[in-house]
């Protein structure tokens, strides 16, 4: 069990405190009679749904540590079931059947204050849930404390462990938004201790800053080899915070019982889950977790409405900025908006519609009555055809100089207009025969279609 604890100070700590006995005895006493019967916190949502749970105060049942971790003598600050906060003054005392051991002065006067207590209380009122994953998940709220009363020049180690609140397994009833007892607890997981990465350190260093266990991770992987805390899902747990004095004496093993002090904050108890069960817990975690900013961009009630494509800001802006392509008669009017003026400019910023060549081209493309001998000839009588259905007449193809071409890449544009369309899968009744201008000998005119003239207007023989 202790071999799973990865800490460079484990060997050193074994000379000052019997960690094996400390962990094994504290966890094995859970199944014993009169073990860890924690009193329910005020407003605890679990207490009213536990028909077989017999709450008892911390003063009636102590946190038994066996031979390694006895209780302090009466009158001293409790080292096991005490939420010792200087501001609140809530210090619990407990009694033991065996004679209490006097604590070392290095730890006897230590008090601990829980940070973010108001947030912990808010979660506790709803029934705190902590996610456990195979890879390990950090706690939120993070367990953070402020320590007082240490010897500034003494060395201390800080560690945490987690003990089951009871011997029950729970399930969440969504219809009543409450937790119910689902049966007896699963077999106990391997007991582990999490050492603060800065341990050991001088008391002055611990007291000058808030101590945060933000590296602690919870997992449900029984074969975890990363040193994470292993918990059973749908079980309730109580975190415990331990301060261990690093005794420099050679025979420090004899004083292991008096060189540590334990603090328990009942508002930090939680249920281990693989997914949040209470939606209020989910909302509170999103609202209070600084790393959940992405979930706070919009109200959860508005998510379906805000994620419709038509309601996206980009789509709205695009719809407002769209302007239909105007006819050539409107290009010079004063009603042109900014969007149209941007459309009428090429990459160099030169207005295109002001060019005579561009106006001539657009008039041929968009006019309803295109002349047959002109440059562009429609496929059939009716509305103008798209550009890919148009063909260049040989009379107008070479009449326009290259440097006056309205488009930036005239060669590519001419090939685009002169590209052959795919053959129609059915006959087109409106298409007449095609004529071939023999005297020009221009291949560009070989496939020119005309709907205005009859085949007789073109002669296949020389004149």
UniProtKB/Swiss-Prot annotation:
GO terms for cellular component: chromatin; nucleus. Residues 333-347 have a biased composition (Basic and acidic residues). This is T-box transcription factor TBX1-A. Residues 119-297 bind DNA. The gene is tbx1-a. A motif (Nuclear localization signal) lies at residues 420-431. Binds DNA as a dimer. Interacts with dscr6/ripply3. Gene3D superfamilies: Transcription factor, T-box. Residues 75-96 have a biased composition (Low complexity). One of its GO terms (biological process) is ectodermal placode formation. It is found in: Nucleus. The keyword Zinc-finger does not apply. GO terms for molecular function: DNA-binding transcription factor activity; DNA-binding transcription factor activity, RNA polymerase II-specific; RNA polymerase II cis-regulatory region sequence-specific DNA binding. Residues 323-332 have a biased composition (Polar residues). Probable transcriptional regulator involved in developmental processes. Binds to the palindromic T site 5'-TTCACACCTAGGTGTGAA-3' DNA sequence. Induces pre-placodal ectoderm (PPE) gene expression in regions where RIPPLY3 is absent. Plays a role in the formation of the anteroposterior (AP) axis during embryonic development; required to establish the posterolateral border of the pre-placodal ectoderm (PPE) acting downstream of the retinoic acid receptor (RAR) signaling. Keywords: Activator, Developmental protein, DNA-binding, Nucleus, Transcription, Transcription regulation. Induction: Up-regulated by retinoc acid (RA) in the pre-placodal ectoderm (PPE) during post-gastrulation development. Up-regulated by retinoc acid (RA) before, but inhibited after, neurogenesis development. It comes from the Eukaryota. It comes from Xenopus laevis (African clawed frog). The C-terminus acts as a transcriptional activation domain. Residues 39-58, 75-104, 320-354, 377-409 are annotated as: Disordered. SMART domains: TBOX (SM00425). Pfam families: T-box.
């Amino acid at each position: 069990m202790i071999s799973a604890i990865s800490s460079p100070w484990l060997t050193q700590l074994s000379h000052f405190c019997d960690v094996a006995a400390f962990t094994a005895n504290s966890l094995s006493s859970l199944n014993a009679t009169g073990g860890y019967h924690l009193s329910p916190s005020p407003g605890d949502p679990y207490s009213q749904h536990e028909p077989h749970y017999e709450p008892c105060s911390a003063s009636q049942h102590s946190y038994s540590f066996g031979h390694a971790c006895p209780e302090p003598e009466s009158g001293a600050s409790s080292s096991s079931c005490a939420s010792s906060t200087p501001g609140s003054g809530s210090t619990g005392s407990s009694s033991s059947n065996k004679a209490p051991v006097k604590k070392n002065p290095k730890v006897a006067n230590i008090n601990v204050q829980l940070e973010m207590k108001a947030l912990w209380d808010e979660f506790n009122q709803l029934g705190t849930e902590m996610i456990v994953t195979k890879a390990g998940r950090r706690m939120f709220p993070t367990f953070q404390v402020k320590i007082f009363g240490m010897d500034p020049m003494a060395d201390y180690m800080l560690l945490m462990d987690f003990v089951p609140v009871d011997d029950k397994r729970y399930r969440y009833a969504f219809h009543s938004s409450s937790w119910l007892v689902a049966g007896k607890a699963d077999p106990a997981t391997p007991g582990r201790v999490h050492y603060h990465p800065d341990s050991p350190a001088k008391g002055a260093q611990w007291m000058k800053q808030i101590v945060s266990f933000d590296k602690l991770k919870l997992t449900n992987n029984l074969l975890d080899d990363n040193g994470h805390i292993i918990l059973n899902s749908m079980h309730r747990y109580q975190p415990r915070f331990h301060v261990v004095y690093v005794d420099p004496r050679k025979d420090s093993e004899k004083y292991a019982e008096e060189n540590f002090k334990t603090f328990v904050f009942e508002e930090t108890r939680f249920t281990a889950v693989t997914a949040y069960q209470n939606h209020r817990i989910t909302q509170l975690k999103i609202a209070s977790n600084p790393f959940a900013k992405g979930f706070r961009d919009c109200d959860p009630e508005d998510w379906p409405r805000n994620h419709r494509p038509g309601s996206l800001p980009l789509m709205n802006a695009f719809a407002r900025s769209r302007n239909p392509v105007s006819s050539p008669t409107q290009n010079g009017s004063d009603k042109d908006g900014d969007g149209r003026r941007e459309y009428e400019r090429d990459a160099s910023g030169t207005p295109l519609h002001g060019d005579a060549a561009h106006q001539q081209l657009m008039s041929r493309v968009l006019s309803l009555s295109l002349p047959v001998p002109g440059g562009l000839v429609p496929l059939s009588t009716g509305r103008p055809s798209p550009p890919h259905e148009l063909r260049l007449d040989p009379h107008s193809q070479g009449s326009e100089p290259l440097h006056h071409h309205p488009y930036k890449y005239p060669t590519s544009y001419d090939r685009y207009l002169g590209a052959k369309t795919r053959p129609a899968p059915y006959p087109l009744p409106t298409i007449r025969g095609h004529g071939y201008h023999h005297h020009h000998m221009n291949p560009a005119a070989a496939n020119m279609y005309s709907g205005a003239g009859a085949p007789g207007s073109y002669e296949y023989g020389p004149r």
